[in-house]
Amino acid sequence: MKKHIKTLKKKLKIFDSKLKEECGVFGISNTKDASALTALGLHALQHRGQEGCGIVTFNGKQYFSEKRFGLVGDNFNKEKVLKKLQGDYAIGHNRYSTTGENTLRNIQPFFADLHIGGLSIAHIGNLTNALLLREILVKDGAIFRTTSDTETIVQLVAKSKREKFLDKLIDALFQIQGGYSLVLMTNKKLVGVRDPLGIRPLVIGKLKNSYIFASETCALDIVGAKFIREVENGEVIIIENEIITSIKPFPKQKPRPCVFEYIYFARPDSLINNKCAYEYRKCLGAKLAEETDIDADLIVPVPDSGVPAALGYAEQSNKKFELGLIRNHYVGRTFIEPTQSIRSLGVKLKLSSTRTIVKNKKVILIDDSLVRGTTCHKIVKMLYESGAKEVHVRIACPEIKYPDFYGVDMPTKEELLAHEKSNKEMCEYIKAKSLKFLSLGGLYNALIKEKRNLNYPQFSDHYFTGEYPIKPHDNLNGLKIKQLSLLSAKSNN
């Protein structure tokens, strides 16, 4: 049965043209409920990765690990499982594979028994020079057990000639490049790290006498923790004996956080710069209405991620907001064999239209982004089949023309609809009456009320501009995974 479910999920991916999240991390210190609280934190971060989850704990003498495929609630919902994870310190990880094969050995957190003591690590993001470093390490005798770029960090720490753990870690950090956030646990420390540009997110909070690192503030909320602040770009925070130490080993740089945390990735109730992601998305929708409004009867969001932008659009344009599409949240857990007839249903397994709402209406369909366009094409068709008079598509971000190399699972450049097609060609492909995107200037105005700095953009906005904040050394796609697999096999022979 599990094989059937896994096969169905794999088949359904061809109907899901959204960008994919880049994993979630959680770490907590000094609490007897470390494993249970970590499971709760990971549950709140489930949207960031659904392929696998893991927790590692430390009880002062020994490390305990549990890693499984699937959702947190399906794997860490039994008391007997959590009781096995003994200790007052814990770190956890939700996986969505952006590099490395989808195998149990690639599920984090990773653990290594180094000569200086145990080390466990959970990582979100991608290292753009991971393949290069891996080749060097393998030639130097390193043996890799996984195809994940996270293990590269562990190997660099192990190889460092520095004596103390923190010095070894910093030595490793100076060798890696990319967008990343790390939570690490040793015999005596809980450590949080954010990349020099702050591309990937990390926050710190407090719960009684415990400190917590998490990818988003929603993970702090679920355990009742107080949000302290975001970990700054290039910052390393060490928690030892419940004393916080902050160091910034990298040369100072202005932050360039991933703009898609604002647009799509972060849960709507999570704080970014002390403002809910939901509010940013409403502002994007309002600005979209300012730039692209047209005569219509209804504003209809693509659920769930298109809802905030659609609300902002409706308020700004003074048009009626309706749930013209209903999402089935349980499709990923359907216990059926995916026959061709089932697969042909496509997007209807996930969405259905409220036909009496859209019938004979001019509809403005709002979504947060347009990637391949396959899902949008099917939704537009569905609305017309339900009797819509016109369907106008409005996208609350600029055209996505370039791939990501910092931890987001997304199509190659050639698969991106906007990479080579004109607006007219894209509109013809999705079969809409019209298609408009939020401008790049409108995006910046909506998010920070500023113009884009042409010399040093305030965000990592390479999806739209092709201006990468860090040179992508490695080819982070299927080719890289194959190369990593070959290197892994070579290092294990």
Kindly label every feature range from the protein language model.
Residues 1-233, 238-296, 302, 390:
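Conserved short alpha-helical segments that host acidic/polar catalytic motifs at enzyme active sites
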Residues 33-35, 98-99, 129, 199-200, ...:
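Flexible loop/turn segments at secondary-structure boundaries
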Residues 76, 146, 151, 321-332, ...:
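A conserved beta-strand->alpha-helix junction
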Residues 142, 162-163, 293-297, 315-322, ...:
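Secondary-structure transition/capping motifs at alpha-helix termini
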Residues 152-164, 303, 315-333:
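Amphipathic alpha-helical
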Residues 173, 188-189, 224-230, 381-493:
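PRPP-dependent phosphoribosyltransferase catalytic core
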Residues 299, 306-313, 317, 321, ...:
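Extended, hydrophobic alpha-helical segments in both membrane/secreted and soluble proteins
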Residues 318-363, 374, 401-408:
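Short, glycine/charge-rich flexible loops or terminal/linker lids adjacent to PRPP-binding catalytic cores
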